[in-house]
């Protein structure tokens, strides 16, 4: 994912005598200031002000990833009521979570004095627009459908009765024993029969049709062309040769994951999710706009869904000959509102000018490391150490903190019995990492943990070792800035034509800190030629790893390494301070607002509250919360935010 999901919590900062750029000092300060407004629950659009503490902490709880890999959205419905305790108890549980300093995030680049603000008081305060490789920014600004002589007419969608559609859907999905469905043509004409044929093939992929005479009446007979394998296979359906095979469209969504939206579309269209492609997934708790491509589904069918879709819309349709690929984007453009800010105009000006001119440290954000007392990087380290008993224990053992009730029971059963089958019975949903590992242990036995672990999807397994690489990188970058500041020095690394080279003494004046990269550890990278290079080695030795041998006996877990810029300077940085009285009102118009002609509420010139509206563009794999952290000078971890907020509200 290019961006990091952040909970809707007040980012108050402790009082500080100066702008010392070190988060460790900020951490030690005592918080006494109380916020002026409450926050809304993660599931509501409206801001809740009557019960700010409960709302604030429930919102943070809704954003918790319940286990190392994060579960699929539908699993949230299984959360048990025993977790709905008072906010104080949830805050106490979150004391066991991670803070930024736990994962090496300790430095700032600017010396300005930080200030308070509330991020995502409304999910509409965080808007992401995808930027394609050619620089085009995705916007939803057109609901029209491309004109195509071979597109089905509007009558295609109304010619079938609800009863006919139900029978056809059951036939399509093999839900009954019928091998065909007969639909009588009431007003018989060739044109009417053509429309019915077209409607069935368009709305129910995998079905074929023919016309039959029965007792002097005309019937359209729908049947399966080639058994179950033909179900929803768009490659088997007729498609005009002159039209591109992929319909590209803009997906505008509110408070919904990208995959959730695609799964909803798949169900409506009766197709498999894998015929959709995209360049990246976007946050849930935000408004996001991105391009999607789908194989052999007409724009008209997609546009027709806008009548029934909740929290997302489709538009800007076009036909092309290619799908989309993950990572094929230039980045994302963010529009962020920080509400109830306390900074002076001078503080805000200094912070934003620094962001525009210098940038921020390109740390891997908190979501890279999970939110429980067992960070994902620890599991990654155990994998690299080939310590499979430790891997199993870290994933399955009980841990303090906020988790779903059934996971707690599963872990307790595992700790008590070490019986994978018994522990698995405690999980109503088996697709989480814990469930997959337990299934693997049941199948392969406790003496073959490697094979059992291999049942977990590859991307999830690799997430752990990538988390460890990120952990090392964050720590080394903090040490690099601590020891050498924000200037390029001899021995630093830069990229020339994609190849890393060291900066030499006689060449150092040709480079700035914005050119410097640092390696993620691996067998195919080089390290700085100053004491930070030695620090990498020392850190890995302390973790029982050999920096000169990052190949693993299991090929998937061999780390080739990579390079990452240590400072990112956002593009298209703009900001303004907006006064407002009502925390529930929007402070800018979204794409959908503009399409629907909704005017912005009239804002006061001198309101009770002030908000900072900021815009900036970032490259892929860069964390927007790290840019916001630099502006506010605040720890972005859920643990820190939750503890700070309960302190203010006491």
Place the predicted regions along the sequence by residue.
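Non-catalytic, substrate/partner-engaging modules appended to enzymatic cores
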Residues: 2-650
């Amino acid at each position: 994912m290019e961006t990091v999901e952040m909970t809707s919590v007040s980012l108050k900062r402790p009082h500080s005598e100066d702008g010392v750029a070190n988060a460790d000092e900020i951490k030690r300060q005592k918080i006494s200031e109380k916020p002026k407004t409450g926050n809304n629950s993660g599931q509501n659009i409206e801001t809740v002000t009557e019960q700010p503490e409960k709302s604030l902490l429930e919102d943070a709880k809704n954003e918790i990833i319940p286990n190392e890999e994060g579960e699929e959205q539908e699993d949230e419905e299984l959360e048990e009521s025993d977790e709905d305790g008072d906010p104080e108890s949830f805050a106490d549980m979150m004391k066991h979570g991670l803070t930024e300093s736990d994962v090496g995030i300790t430095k700032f680049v600017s010396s300005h004095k930080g200030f308070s603000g509330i991020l995502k008081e409304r999910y509409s305060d965080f808007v992401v627009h995808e930027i394609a490789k050619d620089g085009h920014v995705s916007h939803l600004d057109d609901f029209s459908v491309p004109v195509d002589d071979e597109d089905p007419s509007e009558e295609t969608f109304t010619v079938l009765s609800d009863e006919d559609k139900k029978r056809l859907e059951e036939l399509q999905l093999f839900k009954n024993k019928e091998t065909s469905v007969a639909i009588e043509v009431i007003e018989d004409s060739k044109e009417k029969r053509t429309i019915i044929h077209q409607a069935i093939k368009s709305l129910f992929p995998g079905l074929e049709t023919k016309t039959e005479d029965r007792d002097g009446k005309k019937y359209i007979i729908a049947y399966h062309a080639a058994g179950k394998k033909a179900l929803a296979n768009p490659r088997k359906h007729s498609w005009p040769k002159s039209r591109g095979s992929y319909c590209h469209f803009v997906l505008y969504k509110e408070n919904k994951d990208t995959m959730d939206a695609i799964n909803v579309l798949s169900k409506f269209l009766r197709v498999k999710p894998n015929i959709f492609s995209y360049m990246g997934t976007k946050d849930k708790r935000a408004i996001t706009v991105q391009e999607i491509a789908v194989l052999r589904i007409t724009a008209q069918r997609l546009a027709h869904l806008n009548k029934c879709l909740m929290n997302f819309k489709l538009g800007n349709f076009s036909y092309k000959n290619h799908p989309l690929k993950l990572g094929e984007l230039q980045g994302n453009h963010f529009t962020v509102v920080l509400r109830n800010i306390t900074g002076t105009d001078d503080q805000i000006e200094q912070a934003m000018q620094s962001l525009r001119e210098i940038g921020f440290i390109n740390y891997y954000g908190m979501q890279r490391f999970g939110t429980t007392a067992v960070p994902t990087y620890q599991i990654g380290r155990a994998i690299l150490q080939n310590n499979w008993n430790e891997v199993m224990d870290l994933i399955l053992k009980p841990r303090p903190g906020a988790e779903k009730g059934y996971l707690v029971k599963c872990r307790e059963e595992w700790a008590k019995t070490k019986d994978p089958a018994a522990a698995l019975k405690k999980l109503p949903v088996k697709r989480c990492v814990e469930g997959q590992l337990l299934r693997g242990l049941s199948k392969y036995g406790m003496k073959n943990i490697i094979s059992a672990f291999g049942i977990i999807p590859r991307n999830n397994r690799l997430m752990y070792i990538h988390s460890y690489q990120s952990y090392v990188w964050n720590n080394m970058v903090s040490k690099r800035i601590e020891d050498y500041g924000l200037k390029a020095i001899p021995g630093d690394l830069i990229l020339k034509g994609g190849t890393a080279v060291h900066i030499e003494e006689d060449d150092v004046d040709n480079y700035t800190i914005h050119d410097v990269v640092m390696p993620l550890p691996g067998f195919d990278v080089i390290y700085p030629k100053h004491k930070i290079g030695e620090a990498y080695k020392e850190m890995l030795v302390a973790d029982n790893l050999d920096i000169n041998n990052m190949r693993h006996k299991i090929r998937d877990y061999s780390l080739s390494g990579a390079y990452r810029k240590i400072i990112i300077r956002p593009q298209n940085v703009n900001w303004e301070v907006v006064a407002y009285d009502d925390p529930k009102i929007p402070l800018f118009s979204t794409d959908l607002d503009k399409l629907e002609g909704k005017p912005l509420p009239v804002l006061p010139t001198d309101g009770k509250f002030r908000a900072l509206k900021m815009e900036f563009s970032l490259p892929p794999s860069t964390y927007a919360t790290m840019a916001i952290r630099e502006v506010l000078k605040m720890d972005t971890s859920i643990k820190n935010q939750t503890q700070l907020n309960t302190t203010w509200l006491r």
